[in-house]
Curated annotation (Swiss-Prot):
Protein name in UniProt: Protein translocase subunit SecF
Domain of life: Bacteria
Organism in which the protein naturally occurs: Calditerrivibrio nitroreducens (strain DSM 19672 / NBRC 101217 / Yu37-1)
Keyword Isomerase among record annotations: no
Gene3D superfamilies per UniProt: Multidrug efflux transporter AcrB transmembrane domain
Complex formation: Forms a complex with SecD. Part of the essential Sec protein translocation apparatus which comprises SecA, SecYEG and auxiliary proteins SecDF. Other proteins may also be involved.
GO molecular function, one term: protein-transporting ATPase activity
A cellular component annotation (GO) from this entry: plasma membrane
Length: 304
């Protein structure tokens, strides 16, 4: 069983640190492209951050989304997103910022139009929520603070458990993961909402876990070979190789689970799952090729 789970043998000798420059170039290019997309194209902010209205409906029979989109679109009340919510009878209508239309009036207008679109398919309104621009801005600020505090927490934890150099390497790798993931969100125009922020926080924890496993093995090997004249580069390479099989198997299992969620989970959960799919790929890559490379680079610079 153990051999079956050993995707890559522990005695493999891949020179990851020898390829660190290549990894840094690839990551540098991806970060530059991601930042360019984020600052030029921007993120497709959802109602949570930009403000707007959410209306959840439940029909007696499966709803015709194309008819609903065309009918509501004819009202010309701003950006509209209409999608199923869980099953074909449940519909979620998202409206962007409207032209200062009171919520009650907006709700009446939409209800009347919905009844006109498909009079033979009765519906009930399960909820109506409105997020104002001020609340949206406040949520943006809180989301950024959540990501910042998560990274500060990681810095403190890794610095205490290992040493400051490892903490710097881990933080830079996490920032790398978040920036590139945001770049893909911008590129694909996926909706950026609170569930995506939750996915980014989950990504930070997931990527850190993989990095900690590698760092822990490096620390053990440094202690075990303290009296031997072994190059730190060889120690770090050996540690990455020993944990490589575990890292890849864990990442693949998580990746396919989240990929299934993205494909079959419906439109509402798609941005969350997409963020994790990209994050797992980038996070696994950074745990193997970036985090340890950064630690080695910093250690090398300190010796000069």
């Amino acid at each position: 069983m153990a051999q079956f789970l050993e995707l890559i043998k522990n005695d493999s000798n891949i020179d990851f640190l020898g390829k660190a420059k290549l990894f840094f170039i690839i990551s540098g290019v991806l970060i530059v492209i991601s930042l360019f997309l984020i600052f030029t194209k921007g993120l497709n902010l959802g109602i949570d951050f930009s403000g707007g209205t959410v209306i959840q409906l439940k029909y007696e029979k499966p709803a015709d989304l194309n008819k609903l989109r065309q009918g509501i679109g004819n009202l010309k009340i701003g950006d509209v997103s209409i999608q199923n919510f869980g099953n074909p009878e449940e519909v979620l209508i998202r409206l962007g910022k409207t032209r200062d239309i009171p919520l009650e009036e907006l709700s009446k207008t939409i209800r009347a139009k919905l009844a006109e679109i498909d009079p033979n398919n009765k519906f009930i309104v399960e909820r109506v929520e409105q997020v104002g621009p001020q609340v949206g801005s406040e949520l943006q600020y809180k989301a950024m603070m959540a990501l910042l505090y998560a990274n500060i927490g990681v810095l403190i934890y890794v610095a205490i458990r290992f040493e400051l150099i490892f903490a710097i390497g881990a933080i830079l790798a996490l920032v790398h993961d978040v920036i590139i993931t945001l770049g893909f969100l911008s590129l694909t125009s996926k909706e950026f909402n609170l569930t995506v922020v939750a996915a980014l926080l989950a990504l930070i924890g997931y990527s850190l876990n993989d990095t900690i496993v590698v760092f822990d093995r490096i620390r053990e090997r440094i202690k075990a070979t303290a009296n031997e004249k072994i190059n730190i580069k060889d120690i770090m390479n050996k540690s990455i190789n020993e944990t490589l099989s575990r890292t890849i198997i864990t990442s693949l299992l998580t990746f396919f689970t989240v990929l299934s969620l993205m494909i079959f989970g419906g439109e509402v959960i798609n941005p969350f799952a997409f963020t994790l799919v990209i994050g797992i790929i980038v996070g696994t890559y950074s745990s193997i090729g970036i985090a340890s490379g950064l630690v080695y680079l910093i250690k090398s610079l300190r010796k000069r």
